[in-house]
Amino acid sequence: MIRYKFPKAIFVACTASVMIVLAPAVNAQSTELKQVFAQLGATPVVRAQFEQQKKLASLNKIYVSKGTVLFSKNQGVLWQIQSPVKADLVVTPRKLVQKTQRTTSQIEVDKTPYGSVATMFLQLMSGNEAALAKNFNVVSANYSPMQWNVSLTPKSSLFKKLFVQVDAQGQRYVDRITILEQANNRTIIRFSQQTAQPQTLTAAENALFQLAK
């Protein structure tokens, strides 16, 4: 197995963004929170375009990356980054795999601190509400059929090292995620063209997920 250290900026932002999709389950006592969770968790496959803007306060510079994301409850999460470089990031319960045109690198989730983040998210996809309750406080949650928003702050020391607060908003799906990180850095991820179709994964998508089995 190839030992590989995944790029922190891409992995943290992507992982945080996929976690937020199921973060409304943190507080089972909140009616609005449960409504958000039920709405977002009702679809087994979601596809979307994404644009990530990462602002580094110390450099006063914004880095932009774009691509597509595929969320599958049965398989995992597939981020296909199209710019500024092309790469696929596959997250499954066992492995994290990054594939480029020239290389394929993988690491088992229990061999890296970030693996625990990915594992926790995948547990949430199967309905393990207790996992987020161990790591997040819900600052606010508002729901209506036309609009919802959720704000979270981390409990665990691991997440506190990564970010200060996560805000998400959307309608039927997640539309925007704002991650306030340490040192006043900020990552904004916007999702567009969200769709639940096609539900069936392509041969190429299945092949990528097989790399992380």
Provide a role label for each language-model segment.
Residues 133-137, 142-213:
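Gly/Pro-enriched, hydrophobic low-complexity segments
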Residues 1-7:
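N-terminal secretory signal peptides that target proteins for export/translocation
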Residues 100-123:
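Acidic/charged, solvent-exposed loop-and-adjacent secondary-structure segments enriched in E/D, K/R, S/T
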Residues 71-72, 91, 99, 143, ...:
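Generic beta-strand structural signal
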Residues 50, 77-81, 96-99, 150-152, ...:
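Short hydrophobic/aromatic-rich beta-strand segments that constitute the beta-sheet cores
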Residues 24-51, 55-60, 206-213:
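N-terminal leader/targeting segments and the immediate start of mature chains
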